[in-house]
């Protein structure tokens, strides 16, 4: 970006929190990721729209990083604008419906539902990430998923406009939604829940959290579950059968606690993650004949 355009950015986007050449590993769950040219934290939809329209006007690429939980940002970073929704985190309850902005913490949203004795969101009680990412990926666990409770979502189009998509038009599948094809970005989502008993809801959330603590390597940085569940199999079991628990490349290893996770144990890099993912796919294929498909998203530029 030239000096004139930089001056225009500071003038047009005055008042918006924008950081230049900001290392993204400070914000990702994996603790890896190179710099973003411009990292923006809009406080509301108006600021978000200003950022997107400025970027489009100057042909600057832009993307929303969300909560950065189920993704890997490459070591070369991301060109253009990276937008984070940390400040777009409102949660509201209206009757049996919960509406949350895209940056709202998923776990916090389940706690709000519990506080109001609303049932249906318990499955997400321990899933890290944001509402936006959860809808984008159709997050789920223990028999529940976002598709079961979503009513509608407001999305930001590539032009910077906002429109509403009904749940029936989201084309949900296993860890999939139509947004992965359209490139539109979740702004907020509305969920339909049912009245329940507060103590029972709280007990179920605590039970699921306890299961996660027992099974998942929460003590290390990670990107969550790395692979989708292959039909008729469990990814973690296939990885164990290939004797890959504890298998390590650089600072990243297959968790010894849960083989479906890869953890950053010693200043690992995005390249370590990518190399380990590729190695695990190859060795599981050789051992079982099953080709694992990554669930985690990998974005950004490789380091030259």
UniProtKB/Swiss-Prot annotation:
It catalyses: UDP-N-acetyl-alpha-D-muramate + NADP(+) = UDP-N-acetyl-3-O-(1-carboxyvinyl)-alpha-D-glucosamine + NADPH + H(+). The keyword Lipid metabolism does not apply. GO terms for molecular function: FAD binding; UDP-N-acetylmuramate dehydrogenase activity. One of its GO terms (biological process) is regulation of cell shape. The keyword Aminoacyl-tRNA synthetase does not apply. Pathway: Cell wall biogenesis; peptidoglycan biosynthesis. The active site is at residues 175, 225, 295. Gene3D superfamilies: 3.30.465.10, UDP-N-acetylenolpyruvoylglucosamine reductase, C-terminal domain (3.90.78.10), Uridine Diphospho-n-acetylenolpyruvylglucosamine Reductase, domain 2 (3.30.43.10). It comes from the Bacteria. Disulfide bonds: none annotated. GO terms for cellular component: cytosol. It is found in: Cytoplasm. Residues 31-196 form the FAD-binding PCMH-type domain. Its EC number is 1.3.1.98. Keywords: Cell cycle, Cell division, Cell shape, Cell wall biogenesis/degradation, Cytoplasm, FAD, Flavoprotein, NADP, Oxidoreductase, Peptidoglycan synthesis. InterPro entries: FAD-bd_PCMH, FAD-bd_PCMH-like_sf, FAD-bd_PCMH_sub1, FAD-bd_PCMH_sub2, MurB, MurB_C, MurB_C_sf, Oxid_FAD_bind_N. PANTHER family: UDP-N-ACETYLENOLPYRUVOYLGLUCOSAMINE REDUCTASE (PTHR21071:SF4). HAMAP family: MurB. Belongs to the MurB family. Cell wall formation. This is UDP-N-acetylenolpyruvoylglucosamine reductase. It comes from Streptococcus thermophilus (strain ATCC BAA-491 / LMD-9).
């Amino acid at each position: 970006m030239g000096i004139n355009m930089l001056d225009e950015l500071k003038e047009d986007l005055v008042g918006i929190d924008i950081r230049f050449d900001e290392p993204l590993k400070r914000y990702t769950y994996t603790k890896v990721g190179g710099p973003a040219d411009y990292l923006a934290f809009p406080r509301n939809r108006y600021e978000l729209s200003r950022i997107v329209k400025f970027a489009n006007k100057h042909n600057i690429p832009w993307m929303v990083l969300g909560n950065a939980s189920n993704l890997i940002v490459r070591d070369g970073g991301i060109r253009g604008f990276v937008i984070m929704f940390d400040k777009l985190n409102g949660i509201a309850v209206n009757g049996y419906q919960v509406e949350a902005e895209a940056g709202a913490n998923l776990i916090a949203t389940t706690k709000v539902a519990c506080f109001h004795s609303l049932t249906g969101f318990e499955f997400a009680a321990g899933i890290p990430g944001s509402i936006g990412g959860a809808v984008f990926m159709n997050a789920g666990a223990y028999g529940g998923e976002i598709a079961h409770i979503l009513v509608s979502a407001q999305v930001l189009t590539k032009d910077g406009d906002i429109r509403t998509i009904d749940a029936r038009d989201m084309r949900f599948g296993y860890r999939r939604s139509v947004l992965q094809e359209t490139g539109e970005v979740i702004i907020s989502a509305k969920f339909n829940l049912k009245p329940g008993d507060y103590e029972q809801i709280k007990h179920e959330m605590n039970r699921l959290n306890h299961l996660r603590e027992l099974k998942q390597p929460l003590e290390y940085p990670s990107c969550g579950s790395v692979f989708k569940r292959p039909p008729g199999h469990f990814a973690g079991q296939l990885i164990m059968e290939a004797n890959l628990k504890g298998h390590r490349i650089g600072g990243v290893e297959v968790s010894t606690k849960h083989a479906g996770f890869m953890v950053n144990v010693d200043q690992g890099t995005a390249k370590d993650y990518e190399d380990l993912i590729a190695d695990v796919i190859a060795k599981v294929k050789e051992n079982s004949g099953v080709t694992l498909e990554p669930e985690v998203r990998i974005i950004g530029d490789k380091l030259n």
